[in-house]
Regions:
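C-terminal active-site/capping subdomain that shapes the small-molecule cofactor and substrate pocket
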Residues: 224-328
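Oxyanion-binding "anion nests"
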Residues: 190-234, 240
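N-terminal Rossmann-like NAD(P) cofactor-binding subdomain of oxidoreductases
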Residues: 2-191, 223, 247, 278-281, ...
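A glycine-rich, Thr/Ser-enriched phosphate-binding loop motif common to dinucleotide/cofactor-binding enzymes
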Residues: 129-138, 169-171, 205-212, 308-314
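Histidine- and/or cysteine-centered catalytic micro-motif in compact active-site loops
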Residues: 41, 158-160, 200-202, 229-231, ...
């Protein structure tokens, strides 16, 4: 199937946290398409979502074959459902957003500012693309900007509820309401999300995936030590990064700030101004505060994880549609 400059597009998982952001960005960035079809699981079907100011009905995806007439399909759905669709090879080019929590496999993982147009052009026959975890995107972008390809880097990611999707968002809101009413009751295997920060095996596995993704995105990466924790924030995430100062960076630290300032997707915070996760919600940019020392550079990064994931997925579609009138 060929891809025209105005492809037929499907979004699977349209009612989810990332799916909603994806639909909003398609309109905001003026992505030209001939058709936009919204799908969800049976639980999300028959809901309506706002698409370019128009209320659109979301249909249930009965089977992967429902996607056969589309050129591009965004898989903003849980990993098992995405894997089922990919295995079925229904026809369109598939952009797998569920890959963000896994180490890179045999599917090309690409990201804006990190994958060159030349490298992307070599993937024109690919039928599936994967996006990295937003934390991997932020970390790799920062390291590339600073030329930190060696040495040691320590990072701690703090993920808001939206990083886990709409179900986690809903659970966090419900738990917080119950806690404030002093009536929260948890099952034995249920973790308290409201007013609590925690790290489980899931967060540890995500940290392992992020480390592998950064190595893939950079080709040459420093030694990384990454931890991931869940924090009681609904939207947005944060990342602290401590970097052994690359030898090429000298002086009082202004060189590091300027390198980050010109990096794609990064917005430097005003010096002395407080910077919280809430400041990044709804933004496409990664907002960064920089602190420099004689032998190290420390970054405090805040970003809208759902929006950044959607932006990376849409960039793939934009690149596919613009690289040629038709792509085989």
């Amino acid at each position: 199937m060929s891809i025209s400059r105005e492809p037929r597009v499907a979004v699977v998982g349209a009612t989810g946290a990332v799916g909603n952001q994806l639909i909003e960005l398609i309109a905001a960035r003026g992505f030209q398409l001939s058709e936009l079809k919204l799908f969800a699981t049976e639980a999300g079907a028959m809901q309506t979502v706002d698409a370019a100011g128009e209320e659109r009905l979301v249909d249930a995806l009965a089977s992967p074959a429902d996607l056969r007439d589309f050129n591009i399909a965004f898989l903003a759905c849980p990993a098992p459902r995405a894997a089922e669709i990919i295995a079925a090879q229904p026809g369109p080019i598939l952009i797998d957003l569920s890959a963000a929590d896994r180490p890179p496999a045999d599917v090309p993982m690409v990201a804006p500012g990190l994958t060159s147009r030349e490298a992307f052009a070599q993937l024109r026959n690919a039928k599936v693309f994967a996006i990295p975890h937003p934390v991997a995107h932020v970390l790799a972008t920062s390291l590339k900007a600073l030329g930190a390809y060696s040495g040691f880097v320590a990072a701690t990611a703090m993920l808001g509820a939206s990083a886990g999707g709409r179900d986690v968002l809903t659970a966090s809101v419900d738990q917080t309401t119950d806690l404030l009413s002093a009536r929260l009751e948890l099952d034995d295997d249920e973790v308290q999300r409201g007013f609590n920060a925690f790290m489980r095996e899931h967060e540890r596995s995500v940290a392992t995936a992020i480390s592998a993704q950064v190595a893939t995105l950079l080709d040459k990466a420093p030694t990384l030590s990454i931890q991931v924790a869940a924090i009681p924030v609904l939207h947005g995430s944060a990342l602290t990064v401590d970097i052994q100062r690359p030898r090429a960076l000298k002086g009082n630290g202004e060189d590091a700030v300027e390198l980050l300032r010109v990096a794609p997707g990064i917005l430097i915070a005003e010096e002395g101004e407080p910077l919280g996760v809430i400041d990044a919600v709804g933004q496409e940019a990664i907002v960064v505060s920089v602190e420099t020392r004689a032998d190290s550079i420390s970054l405090w990064c805040v970003f809208d994880n759902a929006r950044l994931a959607a932006l990376g997925a849409l960039w793939i579609a934009e690149t596919l549609a613009l690289s040629s009138p038709t792509l085989a």
